[in-house]
Amino acid sequence: MRALIQRVSRAEVTVEGSSIGRIGPGLLVLVCAMRGDPEDAAEKLAARVAKLRIFRDEADKMNRSVQDIGGAVLVVSQFTLAADTRTGNRPGFSSAEAPERGEALYLRFAEALRALGLPVETGAFGADMKVSLVNDGPVTIWMDSADRA
C-alpha cells in the first residue's frame, strides 16, 4: 500500500457538496492499495502511520506522533498514487489493486487506525471527492508498505 501523509491543522472531504469527513489537527492520509499487497499490508501501514513522529515537541523538533498529540486521521482513497509516469504523457494505473480488493484494504487500513485508538474519518471509496486541507509546516511524507519488510 502507498500513502501520502500530510500533517494538517484541519482537513475535510466532500462528495456532491456534502461534507462526509472532517478533522482538526492530525493527519490527512491519501492511500492506495497496490497489486500484490499482502493481506497484512493495511495493518502494518496503519501501525507505521500512527507512530510516525512528525509533530513538534516542546523543543520544536518533530518528535511526536498523531497518537501523542491526541490528533485525528482523515483517510481518503486515491488510486492515482499508483501512477506510472515513466513513459508518455498519460499516466498508467495498472499497478493499482482491483477496486474490490482495493476497497477492502482501504477499509482495513481505516479500521486498523481506529483499533490503535485514533479518531478516524474517511472519504468515499471510488467517489469524486473534493479534499480541502491546511497543511501544517508544510509536512508531507511518502510511505510505501513495500519499502519495509
Swiss-Prot record:
<dbReference type="GO" id="GO:0043908">
    <property type="term" value="F:Ser(Gly)-tRNA(Ala) hydrolase activity"/>
</dbReference>
<comment type="function">
    <text>An aminoacyl-tRNA editing enzyme that deacylates mischarged D-aminoacyl-tRNAs. Also deacylates mischarged glycyl-tRNA(Ala), protecting cells against glycine mischarging by AlaRS. Acts via tRNA-based rather than protein-based catalysis; rejects L-amino acids rather than detecting D-amino acids in the active site. By recycling D-aminoacyl-tRNA to D-amino acids and free tRNA molecules, this enzyme counteracts the toxicity associated with the formation of D-aminoacyl-tRNA entities in vivo and helps enforce protein L-homochirality.</text>
</comment>
<comment type="subunit">
    <text>Homodimer.</text>
</comment>
<dbReference type="GO" id="GO:0000049">
    <property type="term" value="F:tRNA binding"/>
</dbReference>
<dbReference type="Pfam" id="PF02580">
    <property type="entry name" value="Tyr_Deacylase"/>
</dbReference>
<comment type="similarity">
    <text>Belongs to the DTD family.</text>
</comment>
<keyword id="KW-0378">Hydrolase</keyword>
<dbReference type="GO" id="GO:0019478">
    <property type="term" value="P:D-amino acid catabolic process"/>
</dbReference>
<dbReference type="InterPro" id="IPR003732">
    <property type="entry name" value="Daa-tRNA_deacyls_DTD"/>
</dbReference>
<keyword id="KW-0820">tRNA-binding</keyword>
<keyword id="KW-0694">RNA-binding</keyword>
<dbReference type="GO" id="GO:0051500">
    <property type="term" value="F:D-tyrosyl-tRNA(Tyr) deacylase activity"/>
</dbReference>
<keyword id="KW-0963">Cytoplasm</keyword>
<dbReference type="GO" id="GO:0106026">
    <property type="term" value="F:Gly-tRNA(Ala) deacylase activity"/>
</dbReference>
<dbReference type="InterPro" id="IPR023509">
    <property type="entry name" value="DTD-like_sf"/>
</dbReference>
<dbReference type="GO" id="GO:0005737">
    <property type="term" value="C:cytoplasm"/>
</dbReference>
<protein>
    <recommendedName>
        <fullName>D-aminoacyl-tRNA deacylase</fullName>
        <ecNumber>3.1.1.96</ecNumber>
    </recommendedName>
</protein>
<feature type="short sequence motif" description="Gly-cisPro motif, important for rejection of L-amino acids">
    <location>
        <begin position="137"/>
        <end position="138"/>
    </location>
</feature>
